[in-house]
Design a protein with these regions (language model features):
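Active-/binding-site microenvironments in catalytic and ligand-binding cores
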Residues: 1-297
């Protein structure tokens, strides 16, 4: 099948308008309401906090064409060589960052993926893409998130140290996980242990399969994520259908995805349910945003 035929086939499989409305841009996050936030906070008993975000620097694992560069700017010191401004000698240091938000621990906006030339709610790339960013489904419209979270520790369930590239997390691995609409379900595969070996980390990945994607969507899960650089097994279940798992979630169902999570401590302590707080910068027109989510128990 040619690229054009693929695009035509994708367009023929209508997944729009969204059940939340033809103009909806929030997808399953519509389920996260005041009641859901109170439900999440009720899980906090000890005050223990787990930081699920990775440190960003120039060594972050990235594929060609993506990078992170930070340059220190000491403009104030250059302009004020005599010791600073005012009698108190105030001075300051700032930095400039050049990077894509599609690296490190980040939240994908619903504008990130498409099926053919159509994305969430049927909007075409022409509808979405502008010169400086997307016109719709930008991450600036994604609310800050507080919801109930679940952790699926797959290595613990299978009695292994970690999963390997192409290993598929199946619905059977979700036994005992009972999300309700608006919940978040995160996956620990152990792959994140390779984070500091960029070449090894990017050399494939394990992850939830297509059956799990449909399982999450059927239950109204608002957010999911994994300790891997994408979401879903690489190599994929079907070699002819790469990155189909996040495509199902993001494009067809409006389920948000977080990548490059650090779930090791959460898994090591046996935490399975928690309050998840995920905040992000409101970057107009961006397809994603860096985040450092926290789990509270």
């Amino acid at each position: 099948m040619t690229t054009a035929e693929n695009g035509a086939a994708a367009a023929a499989e209508r997944w729009w308008p969204s059940p939340f409305g033809a103009d909806d841009e929030l997808g399953m996050l519509n389920h996260v309401d005041d009641g859901k936030r109170l439900e999440a906070l009720a899980l906090v008993r000890r005050g223990r906090m787990y930081d699920l975000g990775r440190v960003l620097d120039e060594h972050v694992p990235v594929f060609p064409g993506r990078f992170f560069r930070q340059t220190l700017v000491t403009t104030a010191h250059h302009a004020n060589p005599d010791g600073g401004v005012g009698d108190n000698g105030v001075n300051w240091i700032t930095e400039q960052v050049t990077a894509t938000h599609q690296l490190g621990t980040h939240l994908d906006a619903l504008s990130h993926l498409q099926s053919g030339d159509r994305g969430y709610n049927g909007w075409t790339v022409a509808d979405l893409a502008g010169t400086a960013g997307v016109r719709r489904l930008g991450v600036e419209g994604v609310p800050q998130i507080l919801t109930r979270g679940w952790l699926v520790d797959v290595p613990a369930r299978r009695g292994v140290e970690r999963l390997e590239p192409g290993d598929v997390v199946g619905v059977e691995d979700l036994a005992g996980v009972e999300p309700t609409p608006g919940d978040a379900v995160l996956f620990h595969t152990g792959w994140g242990a390779r984070w500091h070996d960029a070449e090894g980390y990017l050399d494939g990945e394990p992850g939830p399969g297509c059956a799990v994607a449909h399982w999450l969507a059927e239950r109204g899960v608002a957010l999911t994520g994994c300790d891997t650089w994408s979401f879903g097994p690489v190599p994929p279940e079907d070699p002819a259908r790469p990155f189909e798992v996040p495509q199902i979630l993001n494009v067809r169902h409006g389920v948000f995805v977080v990548e490059n999570l650090d779930t090791a401590a959460l898994a090591a302590d046996g935490v399975r349910a928690f309050a998840l707080l995920l905040t992000h910068a409101r970057l107009r027109g961006a397809t994603g945003a860096w985040t450092s989510p926290i789990a509270l128990v």
